[in-house]
C-alpha cells in the first residue's frame, strides 16, 4: 500500500481549502497579470509604448488601484516575479494593495518550456529546481497561490502520450511542492488553439490530457480541495473553417470536465486562449447557463481577455488612467455576471472587446 510522506496536517488542508474557496467565491475569478517581461513588451508594442520597467509598473498600478468594487469580480491576482516586488507611485507594495481590497495574491512559478526529446517539437516545463525554496520565500512575501502552465498542441502527430504523461507528472510534482509550502496550486494544462482541428478533436484531446493530469495528481497525493484547475475551453482550432456557437463550446467543455475532473476540485478557472474579450465572456456565460451538472465553480482566469480594452484606453498616457480603469472594471463585471450565467450582451461592444487576441504558439 502506498503512503504519503510528509502528509499534510488537517490544519494545512483547511488553510489551502480556505484560500481556494476565497479565490472562487460566488461571481469571482482571477486576473492573470503574470506576463513575463517579453510578453508584456509585445502588449505595449501594440499601443506604441516602450517596454520599460516603469511602463510595465504603471499599467499594473492602473489595474491594481482600480475602484474597490473590483473585489466583487476578482478573487485573486496572479503576479510575475518582478510585479510581486513593485510598488505604486506612493510607495505601497502591490501585494499590500491587492490584499487590502480583499483579493488573494498569486505568483507564476514555472520557468517556461523546454524541448522534449523524442517528440515532434513538443515541450515540457522547467522550474522544479529549487521550487520548494522559492515557494517558501514567495509565501513569506505575501503570495498564497501559485500557477504553473504546461502546453500541449494538437496536430496529426501530437500530443504524444509521452508529452501528455511528462507534463501531467510535472504539474503534479509542482502541485505537491506548492501545498507543502502553503500555496494553493493552480494547475494549468493548456491545449493550444493553434491549428485547424474541429471541436470534437479538441474535446477528445482535452479529455485525455485532463484524465492524465488527475491520475498524476492522485499519484502525488495532491489534496484536490486545495487546488484549482486552469484549463482551456474546448474550442475548435483557430484556423478551423467551421464556426461553433457559445452553446456548442459549453456542451463540449462541461461534458469534458464531467468525464475527467473530480467534484472535490473547488473551481475551474478557464484561460481565455486568445479569444476576444467578448467571446471569452459569452462562452463562460453559456457554460454557466448549461443544464448539465456543474459540481465545481466555473469561472475565469483571464489575462488578455481582461486587459485588452484597458490597454487600448490607456495608450501609455497618465491622463487616460481613469478611462483604462473603467474599461477594466467593466470587463471584470461582465465576467462576474458570466460566472453566474447572467450576462446579457447588448450587442454594442467596442472594437477592443471584439478583437481576436490570438497569438500562434503563445508563450506567457
From Swiss-Prot:
It comes from the Eukaryota. Substrate binds at residues 56, 147. Keywords: Cytoplasm, Cytoskeleton, Glycolysis, Lyase, Schiff base. SUPFAM superfamilies: Aldolase (SSF51569). Pathway: Carbohydrate degradation; glycolysis; D-glyceraldehyde 3-phosphate and glycerone phosphate from D-glucose: step 4/4. It catalyses: beta-D-fructose 1,6-bisphosphate = D-glyceraldehyde 3-phosphate + dihydroxyacetone phosphate. The record marks 364 as: Necessary for preference for fructose 1,6-bisphosphate over fructose 1-phosphate. Its EC number is 4.1.2.13. GO terms for cellular component: centriolar satellite; cytosol; extracellular exosome; microtubule organizing center. The active site is at residues 188, 230. Transmembrane segments: none annotated. One of its GO terms (molecular function) is molecular adaptor activity. Pfam families: Glycolytic. Its main location: cytoplasm. GO terms for biological process: fructose 1,6-bisphosphate metabolic process; fructose catabolic process to hydroxyacetone phosphate and glyceraldehyde-3-phosphate; fructose metabolic process; gluconeogenesis; glycolytic process; liver development; negative regulation of pentose-phosphate shunt; positive regulation of ATP-dependent activity. It is found in: Cytoplasm, Cytoskeleton, Microtubule organizing center, Centrosome, Centriolar satellite. PANTHER family: FRUCTOSE-BISPHOSPHATE ALDOLASE (PTHR11627). In vertebrates, 3 forms of this ubiquitous glycolytic enzyme are found, aldolase A in muscle, aldolase B in liver and aldolase C in brain. Belongs to the class I fructose-bisphosphate aldolase family. Homotetramer. This is Fructose-bisphosphate aldolase B. The gene is ALDOB.
Amino acid at each position: 500500500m502506498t503512503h504519503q510522506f510528509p502528509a499534510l496536517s488537517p490544519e494545512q488542508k483547511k488553510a489551502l481549502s480556505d484560500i481556494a474557496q476565497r479565490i472562487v467565491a460566488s461571481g469571482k475569478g482571477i486576473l492573470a497579470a503574470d506576463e513575463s517581461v517579453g510578453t508584456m513588451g509585445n502588449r505595449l508594442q501594440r499601443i506604441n509604448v516602450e517596454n520599460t520597467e516603469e511602463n510595465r509598473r504603471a499599467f499594473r498600478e492602473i489595474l491594481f488601484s482600480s475602484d474597490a468594487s473590483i473585489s466583487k469580480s476578482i478573487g485573486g491576482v496572479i503576479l510575475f516575479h518582478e510585479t510581486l516586488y513593485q510598488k505604486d507611485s506612493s510607495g505601497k507594495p502591490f501585494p499590500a494593495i491587492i490584499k487590502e481590497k480583499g483579493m488573494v495574491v498569486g505568483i507564476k512559478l514555472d520557468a517556461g518550456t523546454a524541448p522534449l526529446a523524442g517528440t515532434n517539437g513538443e515541450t515540457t516545463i522547467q522550474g522544479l529546481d529549487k521550487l520548494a525554496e522559492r515557494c517558501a520565500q514567495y509565501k513569506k512575501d505575501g503570495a498564497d497561490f501559485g500557477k504553473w502552465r504546461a502546453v500541449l498542441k494538437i496536430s496529426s502527430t501530437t500530443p504524444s502520450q509521452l508529452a501528455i504523461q511528462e507534463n501531467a507528472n510535472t504539474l503534479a510534482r509542482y502541485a505537491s511542492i506548492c501545498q507543502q509550502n502553503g500555496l494553493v496550486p493552480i494547475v494549468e494544462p493548456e491545449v493550444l488553439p493553434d491549428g485547424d482541428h474541429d471541436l470534437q478533436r479538441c474535446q477528445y484531446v482535452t479529455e485525455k490530457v485532463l484524465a492524465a493530469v488527475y491520475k498524476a495528481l492522485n499519484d502525488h497525493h495532491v489534496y484536490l480541495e486545495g487546488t484549482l484547475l486552469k484549463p482551456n475551453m474546448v474550442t475548435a482550432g483557430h484556423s478551423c473553417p467551421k464556426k461553433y456557437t457559445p452553446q456548442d463550446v459549453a456542451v463540449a467543455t462541461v461534458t469534458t470536465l464531467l468525464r475527467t475532473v473530480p467534484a472535490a476540485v473547488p473551481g475551474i478557472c478557464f484561460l481565455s486562449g486568445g479569444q476576444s474579450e467578448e467571446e471569452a465572456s459569452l462562452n463562460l456565460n453559456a457554460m454557466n447557463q448549461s443544464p448539465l451538472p456543474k459540481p465545481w465553480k466555473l469561472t475565469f482566469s483571464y489575462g488578455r481577455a481582461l486587459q485588452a480594452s484597458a490597454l487600448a484606453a490607456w495608450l501609455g498616457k497618465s491622463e487616460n488612467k481613469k478611462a483604462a480603469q473603467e474599461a477594466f472594471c467593466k470587463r471584470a463585471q461582465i465576467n462576474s455576471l458570466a460566472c453566474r450565467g447572467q450576462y446579457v450582451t447588448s450587442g454594442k461592444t467596442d472594437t477592443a472587446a471584439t478583437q481576436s487576441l490570438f497569438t500562434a504558439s503563445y508563450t506567457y
